[in-house]
């Protein structure tokens, strides 16, 4: 089932208001997938496992957890290399709705107030549920290519009908659709609203590369729970 989320993006930046101080939101489950290519965001679902979009399978990938600010260290920073990356078996450029992969970490993450797991949704989300769009953005002092600020935005889940009216929504199955009231002007805007969290569980991860405009597509995690659980249990050793 496709669902659509309507949200308001404040003018100027993706998720950040025009204030002198930017507040970092609480999202300790976010993992930054750092590479020499485009930025990507995943979610720590178990101590040794990160769930992420399959298109984030990039050379020289490193998983960053904890504090993401390069200029300020607080002891929560962790960089862990993957030892195995497992793409969803049906993923291809012609089947972008299956844009998921599991990353097994070389060692378990060390939990702290900025590093925590997020359970995955085992039921579908009902229309009208207010969910959180959680991702990474660039702080005002950050002129680099890597995001460093956790940001959250609330938005209600809408029905499948509106999603079907959009070109993006009608061409994806197992999807949640997001309609942005204002378009993104920033390159790599997808990392700012990379995940959908409903009732404190991971419900969606962005599909494909965000190409601008007012529609975002998310993989509905609920449809992939059997594959996620089977894979993470089989690969424990």
From Swiss-Prot:
Q: Which family does it belong to?
A: Belongs to the peptidase S1 family.
Q: What does a knockout show?
A: Mice exhibit male infertility, but their mating behavior, spermatogenesis, sperm morphology and motility remain unaffected. Male sperm migration from uterus into oviduct and zona-intact oocyte binding are impaired; however, sperm is still able to fertilize cumulus-intact oocytes. Male show an absence of mature ADAM3 in sperm.
Q: What is this protein called?
A: Probable inactive serine protease 37
User: Which SUPFAM superfamilies did the record assign?
Assistant: Trypsin-like serine proteases
Provide the alphabetized UniProt keywords: Cytoplasmic vesicle, Disulfide bond, Fertilization, Metal-binding, Secreted, Signal
Disulfide bridges in this chain: 40-56, 131-198, 163-177
| Residues forming coiled coils | none
* Species per Swiss-Prot/TrEMBL record: Mus musculus (Mouse)
Gene Ontology terms: cellular component: acrosomal vesicle; extracellular region
What is the recorded function of this protein according to its Swiss-Prot or TrEMBL entry?
Answer: Plays a role in male fertility. May have a role in sperm migration or binding to zona-intact eggs. Involved in the activation of the proacrosin/acrosin system.
What InterPro entries does the record point to?
Peptidase_S1_PA, Peptidase_S1_PA_chymotrypsin, Trypsin_dom
Please, one GO biological process term? positive regulation of fertilization
Please describe the organ and tissue distribution of this protein's expression. Answer: Testis-specific. Expressed in spermatids. Weakly expressed in mature sperm (at protein level).
MF (Gene Ontology):
metal ion binding; serine-type endopeptidase activity
What residue range is the signal peptide? 1-19
